[in-house]
């Protein structure tokens, strides 16, 4: 059934919103709070808008979306307010359609039995985090995701592990999908060819890295070969999650709410594109919209709807140091999978394919070993690393910034 156009908010409601906003600001000032610098948000906080930024009424929007076969809720993994929005949106959808399942990018499919035990109420939070090896497998703060998992358990909603092992994606980026034996593909089929826009976006992402993934592990490659494999690996990743979503929809008949990174869902590329190839052409894409985000991103294709967030204010707590890498465990230790552009790891010179042997004098055999060392690092300190690259050992120094910088 074709998706209905979103109905804009009436001028009367716009005026009411403006008056309420002015009143709220007046109260804030009278209460003695510091005045904020004037900011014009593309999407005001607390307002739903379509992909062009035009406000839409929330109840009709959620009613339409709740009946979609797949609803994809994007996120930036390290943003607490994004995860609160996901939880509240999930609750709203559940009120309109209790026949939901929740799909999570955060865990590989081998951990599905653990998720089943969680939903059945057989595990405490601590037992769940230990059984999933959360800090190693995903790494982002579990407190961001536990409220969503608790909601699913409370309502006995199936929770589905959408991902595959990161090593599969890393191998594809290094060697190409054709080089992966079928028995080692974790059941993932061949991805549909990406759209030209997605291909261009991924190429730009690869170029933004000081040292791109594929080129750092295969220095003789041409940039075109490196980019081709990088795009292919992303397609395999998207396909794996799309196949699991489609399977859940087919076997349960439930609407599947996907909790995924925005890069996998925006502009109907990535996972939505693979879902369409699998026969699910009418997935819905919802995104949180940060107050300081560029308004030019509201191009009409970014999402079916976005929700305006205010400037994030979190309780002050010590900033945990981040190296900025994804790690791939293996029989010989841990290998650097991806390196975030501009991260501590990138500045230190870490590359995809490097094997980390020692951190601060501590032998590193598993991702948890390195995580434990990093969590002990104070802001402004240096972390010596011993790595193996191209068969030779090297010494690098990761310099963590002073807190607040």
Task: Explain the meaning of each model-derived region.
Residues 4-20:
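Bacterial N-terminal signal peptides that target proteins for export
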Residues 16-30:
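Bacterial N-terminal signal peptides
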Residues 32-68:
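N- or domain-start disorder-to-order transition segments that initiate the globular core
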Residues 53-54, 58-94:
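Zymogen propeptides
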Residues 113-246:
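A substrate-binding/cap region within the structured catalytic cores of diverse enzymes
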Residues 152, 351, 357, 372-405:
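PDZ-domain C-terminal substructure recognizer with occasional recognition of PDZ-binding tails
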Residues 298-341, 346, 376, 395-405:
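PDZ/PDZ-like peptide-tail recognition elements
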Residues 345-367:
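Conserved PDZ fold ligand-binding element
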């Amino acid at each position: 059934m074709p998706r209905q156009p979103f109905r804009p908010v009436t001028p009367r409601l716009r005026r009411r919103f403006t008056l309420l906003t002015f009143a709220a600001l007046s109260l804030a000032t009278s209460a003695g709070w510091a005045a904020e610098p004037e900011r014009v948000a593309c999407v005001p906080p607390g307002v739903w808008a379509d992909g062009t930024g035009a406000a839409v009424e929330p109840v009709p929007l959620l009613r339409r979306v709740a009946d979609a076969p797949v609803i994809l809720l994007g996120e930036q993994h390290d943003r607490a307010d994004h995860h609160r929005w996901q939880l509240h949106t999930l609750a709203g959808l559940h009120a309109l359609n209790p026949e939901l399942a929740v799909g999570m990018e955060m865990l590989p499919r081998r951990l599905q039995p653990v998720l089943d035990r969680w939903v059945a109420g057989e595990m405490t939070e601590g037992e769940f985090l230990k059984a999933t090896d959360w800090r190693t497998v995903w790494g982002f703060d579990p407190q961001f995701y536990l409220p969503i998992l608790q909601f699913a358990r409370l309502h006995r909603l199936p929770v589905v592990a959408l991902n595959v092992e990161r090593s599969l994606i890393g191998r594809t980026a290094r060697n190409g999908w054709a080089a992966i034996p079928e028995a080692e593909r974790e059941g993932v089929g061949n991805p549909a060819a990406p759209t030209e826009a997605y291909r261009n976006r991924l190429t730009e992402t690869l170029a933004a890295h000081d040292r791109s993934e594929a080129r750092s592990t295969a220095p003789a490659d041409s940039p075109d070969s490196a980019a081709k494999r990088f795009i292919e690996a992303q397609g395999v990743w998207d396909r794996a999650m799309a196949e699991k979503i489609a399977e859940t929809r087919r076997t349960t008949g439930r609407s599947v709410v996907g909790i995924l990174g925005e890069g996998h869902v925006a502009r109907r590329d990535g996972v939505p594109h693979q879902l369409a190839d699998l026969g699910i052409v009418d997935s819905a894409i919802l995104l949180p919209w940060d107050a300081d985000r560029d308004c030019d991103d509201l191009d009409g294709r970014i999402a079916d709807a976005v929700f305006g967030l205010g400037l994030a204010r979190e309780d002050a707590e010590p900033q945990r140091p981040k190296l900025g890498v994804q790690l791939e465990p293996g029989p010989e230790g841990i290998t650097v999978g991806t390196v975030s552009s501009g991260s501590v790891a990138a500045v230190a010179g870490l590359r995809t394919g490097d094997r980390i042997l020692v951190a601060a004098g501590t032998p590193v055999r598993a991702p948890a070993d390195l995580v434990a060392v990093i969590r002990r690092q104070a802001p402004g300190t240096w972390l010596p690393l011993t790595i193996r690259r191209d068969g030779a050992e090297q010494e690098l120094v990761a310099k963590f910034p002073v807190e607040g910088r």
